[in-house]
């Protein structure tokens, strides 16, 4: 008893002794100012009334002109900090990420429709580390990705065959729609082993992920769950959950039959499916962290949200820029002809030998990042650039603004892929897309960077190269007629979404480069 009392008193004394040290950081931060902020801050809505542009990144640019590259707002009752330079990005996402900015902000739609288990959104901790390791080591490792290369090639050839049919019939093709089908089918087959059943409902999920509600930012409304937004979340969930449940059960039946055949794979059966790996982990009783069915469902949604809309939208932007910049289109075609030739279809393995194609991908992401505003959440009060960043604050990184800033890019409004090839001795590797160059962060940076960056960029580059190799694209105007001469331009107007797509679908009549083109992808 005396020993226990002595230990208790010792712990109390030690805490009292260390308390000034433990709280010194917090106390010192109290003397620091908050980042500049507009006045006044209105009741309930905070500064939401200042977001008066159709798209968030434009409103944030206007505010940064008045309040500087680092400023604070209130989105309803939520403190929000906006950063607009690569130097600030580095402080948040590298210097202080581990201690304060390792978690993302999620809306009520994302939380519900990922079963509160999105690896992209869950707090940094043991579960996140385990799942992230599983994704990198077991799903997106080089061996698995290479085994799935024929599948990805099949999906690209499907797109090319549709384009060839349009070219032959002279019927305009909704290229935007075909790109969404391509990415959705590719991810669905890799993730689930099938392409069709989940496609339509997945689009509804992605659409609402790109929306916000006042209930996400005004705390008295969060528990009420009123309005159409919350009803739509419930409706989508009630339609999506039975579909993904059926897909999982179907996969479990396939696995059961395969075990009865001692692991033998039937002819025509897909041998590598990400869902199989997740089910293997879920059924393994020796795993330190048990994966539940809800967590598997959340990961399925993660893969769709990360790999379908963003890649399709980026590819749509790239094709539109190529149409509007025929010099770039022709230069890319000359590179493909020189490296690949005209007798076979360009392949994913060729991309490493096509630096100009890779630079087109980078230039597209510079001008049209899939996430123009990257979001994080502050989990611990922190000092950044002489200002205090409060715990719980939403952090916004205006990636779009940096991509158009003349301070960091020469002639930033021009689509000029050559900029990535002008560093002598480094080539297009001088600036990469993996979060180490803070003036170009289309996939984020640090621990929360998109793990599928290599897969996404390789797929996008391969499809672009395939289209350039095989077709010219004649733009169809609103009246359904092919545009000629100076009028043959694609509108680059943006609209809101999970990513920021073009406001109008890309409608074209493909023109086969030669009569031999269909033979390149007929098999």
Swiss-Prot record:
Membrane topology: Single-pass membrane protein
Membrane-spanning intervals of the chain: 2-22
Keywords from the UniProt entry: Endoplasmic reticulum, Heme, Iron, Membrane, Metal-binding, Microsome, Monooxygenase, NADP, Oxidoreductase, Transmembrane, Transmembrane helix
Enzyme's top EC category: oxidoreductase
GO BP, sorted A to Z: isoflavonoid biosynthetic process
Residue ranges of coiled coil: none
Entry protein name: 2-hydroxyisoflavanone synthase
InterPro entries: Cyt_P450, Cyt_P450_CS, Cyt_P450_E_grp-I, Cyt_P450_sf
Family: Belongs to the cytochrome P450 family.
Domain of life (superkingdom): Eukaryota
Disulfide bonds: none
One MF annotation (Gene Ontology) recorded for this entry: oxidoreductase activity, acting on paired donors, with incorporation or reduction of molecular oxygen, NAD(P)H as one donor, and incorporation of one atom of oxygen
Organism of provenance: Glycyrrhiza echinata
């Amino acid at each position: 008893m005396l020993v226990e009392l002595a230990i208790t008193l010792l712990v109390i004394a030690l805490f009292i002794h260390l308390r000034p040290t433990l709280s010194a950081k917090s106390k010192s931060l109290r003397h620091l100012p908050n980042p500049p902020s507009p006045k006044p801050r209105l009741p309930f809505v905070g500064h939401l009334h200042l977001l008066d542009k159709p798209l968030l990144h434009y409103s944030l640019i206007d505010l940064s002109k008045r309040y500087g590259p680092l400023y604070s707002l209130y989105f309803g009752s939520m403190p929000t900090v906006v950063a607009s330079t690569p130097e600030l990005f580095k402080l948040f996402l590298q210097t202080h990420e581990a201690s304060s900015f390792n978690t993302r902000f999620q809306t009520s739609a994302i939380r519900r429709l990922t079963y509160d288990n999105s690896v992209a959104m869950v707090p940094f901790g043991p579960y996140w580390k385990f799942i992230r390791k599983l994704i990198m080591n077991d799903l997106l490792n080089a061996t698995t990705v290479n085994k799935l290369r024929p599948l990805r090639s099949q999906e690209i050839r499907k797109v090319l065959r549709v384009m060839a049919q349009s070219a032959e019939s002279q019927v305009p093709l909704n290229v935007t729609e075909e790109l969404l089908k391509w990415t959705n089918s590719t991810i669905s087959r890799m993730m689930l082993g099938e392409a069709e059943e989940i496609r339509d409902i997945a689009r509804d999920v992605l659409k609402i992920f790109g929306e916000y509600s006042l209930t996400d930012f005004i705390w008295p409304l969060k528990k009420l769950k009123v309005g159409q937004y919350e009803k739509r979340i419930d409706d989508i969930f009630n339609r999506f959950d039975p579909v993904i449940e059926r897909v999982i059960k179907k996969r479990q039946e396939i696995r059961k039959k395969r075990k009865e055949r001692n692991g033998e794979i039937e002819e025509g059966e897909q041998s590598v499916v990400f869902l199989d790996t997740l089910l293997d982990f879920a059924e393994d009783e020796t795993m330190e962290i048990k994966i539940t069915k809800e967590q598997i469902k959340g990961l399925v949604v993660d893969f769709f949200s990360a790999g379908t809309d963003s890649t399709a939208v980026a590819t749509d932007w790239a094709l539109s820029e190529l149409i509007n910049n025929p010099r770039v289109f022709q230069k890319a075609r000359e590179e493909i002809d020189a490296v690949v030739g005209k007798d076979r279809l360009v392949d994913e393995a060729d991309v490493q030998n096509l630096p100009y194609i890779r630079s087109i991908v980078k230039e597209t992401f510079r001008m049209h990042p899939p996430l123009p505003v990257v979001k994080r959440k502050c989990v611990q009060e922190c000092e950044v650039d002489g200002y205090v960043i409060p715990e719980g604050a939403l952090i916004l990184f205006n990636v779009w603004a940096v991509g158009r800033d003349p301070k960091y890019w020469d002639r930033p409004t021009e689509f000029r892929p050559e900029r990535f090839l002008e560093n002598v001795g480094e080539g297009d590797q001088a600036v990469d897309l993996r979060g180490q160059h803070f003036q170009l962060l289309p996939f984020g940076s640090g621990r929360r960077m998109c793990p599928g960056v290599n897969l996404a960029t390789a797929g996008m580059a391969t499809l672009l190269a395939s289209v350039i190799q095989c077709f010219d694209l004649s733009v169809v105007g609103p009246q359904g007629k092919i545009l000629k001469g100076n009028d043959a331009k694609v509108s680059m107007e943006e609209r809101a979404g999970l990513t920021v797509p073009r406001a109008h679908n890309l409608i074209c009549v493909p023109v086969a480069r030669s009569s031999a083109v269909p033979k390149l992808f007929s098999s």
